């Protein structure tokens, strides 16, 4: 038996349609589409009516171009392979004044999106004056030059409700957008909203915006806990099997380095064929697994195995669910296991069997 990572294609597609809510989305497909597989995700998103994509990798951007010849593809990281960016008609961020002045000749013919730094401080122009400096210099540049097609930022605090930072970054951003538009500047694409912001705004675009740039919600995880589970549906299942059930006694230690001390006689431990080598985070192993519709506590994690404390209703060959729509990735995000994307990224697709299921089972 081999632990299996599987995605229900119909549920994945329907979730994307529901998330889109008839709004223009830029689907974030970075890191191999959150490890759902880039080709699979792009194909499904196209079926859902999405024709604009973003990633952080030039290699992935080129792959998307091969999959979607007519799509708009936005590269969120600045790169230096300018000929490749031009050749594949990829849009790219313009991250700073320094980058602009160092490479404005290299950028000739490339579509760029001016990036506002905002509270995240990861990349971008620091204020309106820096953005206008580029716009003015670009206007007076008589040489072959870049094409300013977009304006964007990233909200780093849209999933935080106990602080005012989202309102601050949203307000600062809207002031930038409205100031530029009021001075007659025009942009084909204006985008800022991530999944959390998109849902906080009622699944509609902010004023003047052309797209919401949505990632994790498209993959079936809620960006914050107060959202109803029915609003975003997980299509992913991660399952393993019980190899055998062992009976242990009070005082026994099970697992490496005294991982679990047994406190009751005749305790039953299911040995399950999945472990941290398959991508189960140690923080996830502090919680439960689902067997025959019931949750049981995980007691120890090893490279290729785990111990789950069970009862007499669990037997060899029973399925053990680590994730599905009843025991969701986002549930464990909110319990502190790790970000949705962190749990997805940890899974080892070289050791897990991968399946894409075409029906509702």
Curated annotation (Swiss-Prot):
Transmembrane segments: none annotated. Keywords: Isomerase, Pyridoxal phosphate. The modification N6-(pyridoxal phosphate)lysine is found at residue 30. Substrate binds at residues 122, 303. It catalyses: L-alanine = D-alanine. InterPro entries: Ala_racemase, Ala_racemase/Decarboxylase_C, Ala_racemase_C, Ala_racemase_N, PLP-binding_barrel. One of its GO terms (molecular function) is pyridoxal phosphate binding. Pathway: Amino-acid biosynthesis; D-alanine biosynthesis; D-alanine from L-alanine: step 1/1. One of its GO terms (cellular component) is cytosol. Its EC number is 5.1.1.1. It comes from the Bacteria. Pfam families: Ala_racemase_C, Ala_racemase_N. HAMAP family: Ala_racemase (MF_01201). Catalyzes the interconversion of L-alanine and D-alanine. May also act on other amino acids. Belongs to the alanine racemase family. This is Alanine racemase 2.
């Amino acid at each position: 038996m081999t632990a299996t990572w599987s995605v229900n294609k119909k549920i994945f597609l329907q979730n994307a349609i529901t998330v889109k809510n008839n709004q223009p989305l830029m689907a974030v497909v970075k890191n191999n589409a959150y490890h759902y597989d880039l080709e699979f995700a792009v194909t499904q998103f196209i079926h859902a009516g999405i024709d604009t994509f973003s990633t952080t990798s030039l290699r992935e951007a080129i792959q998307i171009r091969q999959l979607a010849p007519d799509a708009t593809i936005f590269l969120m990281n600045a790169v230096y392979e300018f000929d490749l960016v031009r050749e594949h008609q990829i849009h790219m961020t313009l991250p700073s004044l320094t980058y602009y002045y160092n490479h404005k000749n290299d950028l000739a013919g490339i579509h760029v999106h001016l990036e506002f730094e905002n509270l995240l401080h990861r990349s971008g122009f620091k204020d309106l004056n820096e953005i206008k400096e580029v716009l003015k210099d670009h206007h007076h540049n008589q040489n072959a030059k870049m094409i300013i097609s977009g304006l964007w930022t990233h909200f780093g605090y849209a999933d935080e409700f106990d602080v005012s930072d989202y309102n601050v970054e949203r307000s600062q951003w809207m002031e930038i957008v409205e100031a530029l538009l009021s001075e007659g500047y025009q942009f084909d694409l204006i985008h800022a909203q991530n999944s959390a912001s998109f849902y906080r705004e009622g699944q509609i675009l902010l004023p003047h915006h052309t797209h919401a740039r949505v990632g994790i919600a498209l993959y079936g995880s809620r960006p914050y806990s107060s959202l109803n589970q029915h609003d975003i549906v997980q299509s992913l299942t991660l399952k393993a099997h019980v190899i055998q059930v062992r009976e242990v006694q009070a005082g026994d230690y099970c697992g490496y380095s005294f991982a679990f001390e047994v406190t009751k006689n005749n305790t039953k431990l299911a040995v399950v064929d999945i472990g941290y080598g398959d991508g189960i985070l140690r923080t996830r192993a502090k919680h439960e697994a689902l067997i025959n519709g019931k949750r049981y506590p995980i007691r120890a994690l090893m490279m290729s195995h785990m111990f789950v404390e069970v009862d007499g209703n669990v037997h060899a060959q029973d399925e053990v669910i680590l994730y599905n729509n009843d025991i969701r990735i986002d549930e464990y995000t909110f319990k502190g296991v790790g970000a949705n994307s962190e749990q997805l990224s940890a899974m080892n697709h070289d050791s897990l069997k991968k399946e894409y299921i075409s029906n509702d089972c």
